[in-house]
């Protein structure tokens, strides 16, 4: 790791504090983030972005975890192209985080089951929809159509995505002058940090 700049180190540490709050506080602006993957096909290659809920953050391993329906496109997209991006924005503090990561599906059944058992019932209901995401319907889907007794749903379509952070691009908007910096990450911390023109 390079010799750290005290100001950059403070920013880096503050990023992890806010991300942790985002994972544990529902009303924190970082609780939701834009998660982008690459859709690869013979016809075209294009990005796909959706909002996901930040579920867990680990500064020691430089990872972020979100939950997913195993039938969603992002699961197959990550398997084909694991490099993903995440965008967070705090409107009050005017802080934007753009994160580049390497994402993968968690393979540990024990961890998946434990996370499922700890989830709230209202969250579990999302995984009892009888159709995969993006399925065409004749009318809007109703929660009354949930198949709560179907053993092939619920836990069987519930998955975890763990993303290993590779880069963090920090931007603080300020009328006296925007502040932007980047952190390149490896193993347990940043190896390069530098100021960037906003």
List PLM regions with ranges.
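Binding-site signature for planar aromatic cofactors or substrates
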Residues: 1-198
């Amino acid at each position: 790791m390079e010799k750290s700049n005290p100001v950059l180190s403070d920013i880096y540490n503050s990023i992890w504090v806010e991300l942790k709050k985002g994972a544990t506080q529902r009303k924190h602006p970082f609780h939701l983030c834009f998660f982008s993957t690459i859709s690869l096909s013979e016809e075209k290659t294009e990005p796909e972005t959706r909002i996901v809920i930040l579920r867990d953050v680990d500064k020691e391993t430089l990872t972020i975890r979100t939950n997913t329906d195993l039938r969603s496109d992002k699961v197959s997209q990550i398997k084909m192209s694991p490099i993903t991006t995440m965008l967070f924005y705090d409107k009050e503090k005017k802080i934007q985080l753009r994160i580049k990561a390497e994402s993968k599906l968690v393979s540990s059944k024990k961890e998946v089951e434990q996370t499922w058992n700890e989830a709230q019932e209202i969250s579990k209901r999302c995984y009892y929809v009888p159709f995969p995401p993006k399925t065409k319907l004749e009318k809007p889907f109703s929660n009354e159509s949930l198949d709560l007794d179907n053993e092939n749903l619920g836990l069987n379509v519930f998955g975890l995505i763990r993303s290993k952070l590779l880069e963090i691009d920090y931007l603080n908007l300020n009328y006296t002058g925007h502040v932007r910096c980047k952190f390149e990450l490896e193993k347990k911390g940043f190896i390069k940090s530098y100021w960037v023109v906003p």
